[in-house]
Amino acid sequence: MFYVIDRNIRNRGIEIRLSTPVKRLIRGENNEVRGVVTGGAGGERRVAAKRGVVLACGGFECNEEMKRQYWQGKPILTASTLGNTGDGIQMSQAL
């Protein structure tokens, strides 16, 4: 599966940036998402999207406030990574 995804990404010239946290989404005139503002070691950078933005950001298992708000039960264990803090979900909700 990953081979097929990797091949399609390379064939289409799609750029993937790792370790590049998104600070906020950029909206266009009709409120569509037109790009992102990233922030890293080199400072903030605006990145325009040609055909869309994919938020591959995980869940919110490490965000206590969001768990209280959205989970009906109180799970004891989770298999998520520490980076699942709901940042991407909150950015999309802010639109």
Placement of each model-derived feature along the sequence:
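Conserved redox-cofactor binding core of oxidoreductases
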Residues: 1-44, 50, 64-65
